[in-house]
Amino acid sequence: MHITNLGLHQVSFQSGDSYKGAEETGKHKGVSVISYQRVKNGERNKGIEALNRLYLQNQTSLTGKSLLFARDKAEVFCEAIKLAGGDTSKIKAMMERLDTYKLGEVNKRHINELNKVISEEIRAQLGIKNKKELQTKIKQIFTDYLNNKNWGPVNKNISHHGKNYSFQLTPASHMKIGNKNIFVKEYNGKGICCASTRERDHIANMWLSKVVDDEGKEIFSGIRHGVISAYGLKKNSSERAVAARNKAEELVSAALYSRPELLSQALSGKTVDLKIVSTSLLTPTSLTGGEESMLKDQVSALKGLNSKRGGPTKLLIRNSDGLLKEVSVNLKVVTFNFGVNELALKMGLGWRNVDKLNDESICSLLGDNFLKNGVIGGWAAEAIEKNPPCKNDVIYLANQIKEIVNNKLQKNDNGEPYKLSQRVTLLAYTIGAVPCWNCKSGKDRTGMQDAEIKREIIRKHETGQFSQLNSKLSSEEKRLFSTILMNSGNMEIQEMNTGVPGNKVMKKLPLSSLELSYSERIGDPKIWNMVKGYSSFV
């Protein structure tokens, strides 16, 4: 299933918002209907033209989205029923009937009818007795389908101010030395989607995310992933703790992989130094689907891998021959958590459980007294001593972090939901640590952090300076951000995890005062809707 570009040729704009230079192919009251196939380059700013072309390529009605998604899922469930020796004729007949309709003739009733037929046939053909068992089976079928697809690298490119940037995303299944996956348990080219809540060996949805400039130089690198918790297993059970440990070891292996020179040294028998800054984006309260216990699993597992004074941490890594080799790592991990959703930023939930954790980690990163007197210590001071050219950037980011934390600005949106998580991640990379970030699934909040980092790192690369705190995005910066959101690789990752692209961070709530500031940060409602994509259907 691949339906990122839906191929619909007509898109409606409100009057006054049409694409200048396009030829109108029809008239409706208050609306210009424009044919994508006949769009010509107009005289408007090229950045706006590019965004409008993206809109025309991707945008479709919600009914159309839900129809395509429901129909493609129906194909998956038909295959599962066939493999079990069942009869798919009723589902096929319903699909054939829908195929005779034009898109405008289909409504939610038709889609609900298809979904109902699918549920009834799965229940009847597979001998399922109750609703809970049915829901579990439907989820299992679709999760198995997603996990048996090949997950390949995603490479995207954008141009800005005449410079080209490459976004390189490497899934865990392609973290290889030669042709061999580095991890203890093989991926065999497949993925672990975010619905794999009982997975014991692998982290769900783990990727190495790089930004490379037009000279081929890496300007940012980090690991993005789903939560280090097999939260589908019984809470506080030994098997859940073991699963978290396995996932944590895999994250450290991936972090080592992201530093090829360190990995090579480690495989040659040397003990290497590795620092990791883990930034979680969960909201740890009882109201958020168990994110409090998930965070405990993750923090406990990562801290448990920190090297003790008695010796380095031992890991098993596959070498180029595919053989497991024990490597020694002087490992230091600091763990943060900053809630970035509406519950955290609009209702103030989840902070009580992480303030102490964050304060301790800031002491490790910037020194015990930094928040009080501004004197940089900790890992940051060590980095400045080893690499003096990073000093100005470290001081700039550190002072912003100090202002945010001392004024508790991270606990409110204020036009920048990811203000602290982004700066901690950028500081980690600047001082030579491996930044890692995650939410529950590794696709929505994690994807937005990924996009915010890419926007800021391009700004820094072009201007030589990070953004000021509390500064609003200019019109040009909004266009850059929009372009990144559409071309960062996030949509492809979302599709691998759910079957369709779309970010759940984009929400319209009954009370607009509870909404995050992404309508303002993006600026263009068309792009906002494209980024939202199919997320309301998964």
UniProtKB/Swiss-Prot annotation:
Changing residue 155 to D: In plasmid pCP301. Changing residue 73 to R: In plasmid pCP301. Changing residue 439 to S: Loss of activity. The active site is at 439. Induction: By growth at 37 degrees Celsius. Changing residue 252 to A: In plasmid pINV_F6_M1382. This is Inositol phosphate phosphatase IpgD. It comes from Shigella flexneri.
